[in-house]
UniProtKB/Swiss-Prot annotation:
Keyword Phosphoprotein among UniProt keywords: no
Keyword Signal listed: yes
Protein name: Dense granule protein 2
Entry keyword set: Glycoprotein, Signal
Additional remark text: This protein is one of the antigens specifically recognized by patients infected by Toxoplasma gondii. Possible candidate for an effective vaccine - of special value for immunocompromised patients such as those with AIDS or neoplastic disease.
PTM characteristics: May also be O-glycosylated. The N-terminus is blocked.
InterPro entries noted in UniProt: Gra2_protein
Extent of the signal sequence: 1-23
Biased composition (Basic and acidic residues): 43-66
Positions annotated as glycosylated: N18
Region (Disordered): 41-75, 142-185
Cellular component terms (Gene Ontology): symbiont-containing vacuole
Amino acid sequence: MFAVKHCLLVVAVGALVNVSVRAAEFSGVVNQGPVDVPFSGKPLDERAVGGKGEHTPPLPDERQQEPEEPVSQRASRVAEQLFRKFLKFAENVGHHSEKAFKKAKVVAEKGFTAAKTHTVRGFKVAKEAAGRGMVTVGKKLANVESDRSTTTTQAPDSPNGLAETEVPVEPQQRAAHVPVPDFSQ
């Protein structure tokens, strides 16, 4: 049981670090804006004054200009990636408990909704909601595991000896019913 809690904690911390890194990248794009500094490989004083003392114009930018992606599209793309990661986390947690799966799925949807606002604040809200949700999922998962370890494996009402809560559910069946939001908005 300790190993499961430890693994869940490592997964949750890794996901939060990833979310905070993405939010930091996004906030840098929003706050700094585009910076266009040409670089020719020569020091500035040699570029301005030629070898014989004549004045030469600055060299044009040799980099190929890439079309800039609007901030809202970048935010939508990052939100979609985060949603898919949380959904994958929900499916992994769902191997242990249906309630934990539903809670993690709700966390993923809330995170997507908050991140869809295309603001740094939205990402911060999503990160905080994901952190709280993952801690809650971890606690529920720990409670489910402790309940399973203390209960008997044979239920009086079941004909084959499995309790209703111990019936295995295939992750493919569960994933088929999860709606994926429309990211084109």
